Each structure stands twice: as C-alpha cells, then as structure tokens.
Amino acid sequence: MEAAIVDQQISDAELDIMKIIWANEGPALFAHIMDSLAAKGKTWQKNTVIMLLSRLKDKGYLKAKKIGRRNEYIPLVSETEYQTFQTKKLLDKVYEGNVKGLVSNLIQSDLLTGEEYRELKKLLDGGR
C-alpha cells in the first residue's frame, strides 16, 4: 500500500464506496462497485458514483488505472489505516486523548458483548 495522507475527511457515501473497494481485496472495476452498491440497496446514478470516486481520488484515498475502456480503482489507504485515523480522531475529540476513558465507556455502557469483553481483556492483559 502506498503512503497516503489519511487526514482528509470523507463523507458517508464516499465511505460506502471505500468499504466496497476494501472488501474486494484488490483493484475494483466500476461495474463491480455499481453492482455492490445496488446489492446494498443504494441505487445511485452512474454520474453520482463517478463524482464520489473522483473526490476520493482528489483526497488521496484512491487511484484509477485505465484498463482498456474501463477504470480500475486501487485503494491508496487501507481499511486499517482509515480505522486507526478515525479512532485517534474520536479519542482526541471526545476523550481528549484519554484511552482509559474510551475503554471505560465501552465497558460501562454495555456496548460490548461478553465475547468482545473477553477478547478486549485478553488484549489488555497482553495475551497472558
């Protein structure tokens, strides 16, 4: 994965497209993106998707490669990089960088299932 600037905010619609490309685990053709959106109940016009892909390219999240008459879209930011950026942003904005506050909130607000709690505890214990 090429280094990219991840600090560009993306819209929910742009994130929907990135999730499709990330799930593809490699370059995605425009037709695949359109089919995947339709399967998720998103009946966006072709021009709307083209505009969203263009914005993602401008923001450094994607690059397009011409294959004959088709475009292949390649992610420049991995899903993990994006998740890390968003988690840090939430941590800084809402919890003022206090990881303990975030984890405490997750546990005390019953947002975690029993299995998720055990997995988190194992991670925090360092696998001990």
Predicted regions and their residues:
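Short beta-strand "wing" residues that participate in macromolecule-binding interfaces
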Residues: 63-64, 114
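Glycine-centered, phosphate/nucleic-acid-interacting loop/turn motifs that mediate DNA/RNA or nucleotide
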Residues: 60
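Short, positively charged loop/turn segments that connect secondary-structure elements
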Residues: 38-49
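Alpha-helical DNA-recognition elements
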Residues: 55
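Short, cationic-aromatic polyanion-contact patches
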Residues: 67-85
